[in-house]
From Swiss-Prot:
Family: Belongs to the anhydro-N-acetylmuramic acid kinase family.
Keywords (A to Z) from UniProt: ATP-binding, Carbohydrate metabolism, Kinase, Nucleotide-binding, Transferase
Lineage of the species this protein comes from: Bacteria, Pseudomonadati, Pseudomonadota, Gammaproteobacteria, Thiotrichales
Domain of life: Bacteria
Protein name: Anhydro-N-acetylmuramic acid kinase
Organism: Hydrogenovibrio crunogenus (strain DSM 25203 / XCL-2)
Amino acid sequence: MSNPPSKLYIGLMSGTSLDGVDAALVSIQNGELELKAFQTFPYTDNLKKQLHHLNQTPHVDLKALCDMEYQVANAFSEATQQLLDNCDHVASDIRAIGSHGQTIFHAPDIPMSLQIGHPAFIAKNTGITTVADFRIDDMANNGQGAPLAPAFHQKLFGNTVGTAVVNIGGISNITFLDQQKTLGFDTGPGNGLMDEYCEQFFNCSYDADGKMAQTGQVNMALLSDLMQEPYFRLPAPKTTGKDLFNSDWLNPFLAKYSNVSKKDILSTLNQLTVDTIIQGLNTLPSQPKRLLICGGGAENKTLISRLQAQLSYPVKTTQSVGVPPHAIEAMMCAWLAEQRLNNTPIALQHITGATKDSVLGAVWHP
């Protein structure tokens, strides 16, 4: 009699902030998820620099792209092995890895989405079955391929009707858990523009706790100009990324407002994230009863306090309901792997605009 499959999965995620690899060890049994361990393994400075360049360069050298594909796969493999070592597990304990990869280009209008960090290398390097390439099946069914997070938010928080979940990574997205259907879409910039501005002008990778933004003043003229971006007025379903909201998008505004102090600009970028989230919340079919925040933006106290100041309902991080804000997307990847191995379609029609729900991802064996 064969042994039952392991209930343990590893989820690997690197978002548009390009911080490194988020790795989650997740138990999934009888439809219930339990986070066993979570760690972030930072990219090397050199790899991060190369990925930033690749992410903002639509015309790339194929050799450089293949080199990055290989390097990111190795980074994901090393993160897996370190997580296993730190948790006293071995490869045979794990049923599968769910690897999102590193998004380099996402273009629903083509439609195509490119994530690098080839899963064949991850599977062979770790000795663990690897599930990846989650977005393209949805796009093949006329969906936007993003955001995927709302489907997982439904899984985690689906019994809390009237909850809105906002994931603030490099880009922000909203999930609204409603009795009729789950809605979700990208609102616009999250931490991405602020992080790039900090790297360029403050010699740091991000604004810790939003402290620098708090000391600045919002420049209302600049904010008004930023808010004219056509994406903000598009109806859902919609998705965006760093291919739009990057330094190339921001630089013309910086040139126009060159007399504005750096801290005031950072404060204004913080408010841009707040206002575009509020704008997205205002398009929902009914007012949420509460707002849960996850992603790196959950640590930006200035951003959170500004959101709460403009909303009449409670704003809390997902930690308040027992789920670490940083771990959710990596947990999602573990769940997507389990769903793929069970051939379970993911309900995305009301989120991405797909014509039918899809079984997401492909499988690579060790």
